[in-house]
A protein has these predicted regions:
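Extracytoplasmic gate region of multi-pass secondary transporters
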Residues: 1-42, 46
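Intracellular helix-loop hinge segments at the cytoplasmic ends of transmembrane helices
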Residues: 24, 107-117
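Small-residue hotspots at the loop-to-helix junctions and early N-terminal turns
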Residues: 34-42, 123-127, 158
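Residue-level signature of mid-helix packing/kink "hotspots" within the transmembrane helices
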Residues: 45-53, 137-138
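Helix-to-loop junctions at the C-terminal end of transmembrane segments
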Residues: 51-64, 148-149
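C-terminal transmembrane helical hairpin of 12-TM major facilitator-type secondary transporters
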Residues: 65-110
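A late C-terminal transmembrane helix in Major Facilitator Superfamily
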Residues: 116-154, 161
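Multi-pass alpha-helical transporter architecture, strongest
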Residues: 162-192
């Protein structure tokens, strides 16, 4: 269970490194008017909504650990694209939507892994997962802010996010190799 918490705390830090600085990224780098930020946040939120469904669908169709690794891998690439193309308004909007999708799609498969690993402690596992997401929030926001303190632009937190998501990907791969019983495809089953 601690290994899964580490995957979440590090891998989801990539989301928060990007999302914590989305407003200055959009206004300072992409050059959107501040009045457009609520609409951009709705776009990201709509992507997150779709991501929840995508993650659940993927967890049903393949092994949850594999789904998590694939999604973290794609998230790494997309965060690098955010870093590279944030000066283009249309690319920035499209990547915000895709980041929204990817950021939430990993949640379902990784939660399934945790619940399966918990064995009769599912409620406690769910609480630990929430704590891991909170750790990811603080780690991502903190590490994403370091380049800003050093004088780099607002696209750099996305690069930090890519490294964190890559850490989540590596941990998923190691998890799949080390804990094979928890990485098998899930048949629909009652959890609680």
């Amino acid at each position: 269970a601690l290994y899964i918490i580490a995957i979440v705390a590090i891998g989801f830090g990539g989301l928060f490194a990007w999302f914590s600085y989305i407003t200055p990224l959009m206004t300072e780098v992409s050059k959107f008017e501040p009045s457009k930020i609520p609409s951009i946040m709705i776009l990201a939120g709509f992507g997150m909504l779709i991501g929840n469904f995508l993650g659940g669908w993927m967890a049903d169709k393949m092994r949850p650990a594999l789904a998590s690794a694939i999604l973290f891998g794609i998230f790494v690439v997309v965060l690098i694209l955010v870093f590279s193309f944030s000066e283009n308004k249309m690319a920035s909007l499209a990547l915000t939507f895709v980041c929204g999708i990817l950021s939430m799609s990993v949640g379902s498969p990784i939660n399934i892994i945790m619940i399966r690993a918990a064995k009769k402690s599912e409620m406690l596992a769910a609480a630990f997962m929430q704590a891991a997401f909170n750790i990811a929030n603080s780690v991502g926001a903190y590490l994403g802010g370091i380049p800003l303190i050093k004088g780099y632009g607002y696209q750099y937190p996305s690069l930090v996010g890519a490294f964190l998501a890559f850490g989540g990907l590596l941990l998923c791969v190691v998890f799949m190799l080390k804990f094979k019983p928890f990485t098998q495809k899930v048949e629909n089953e009652d959890v609680l």
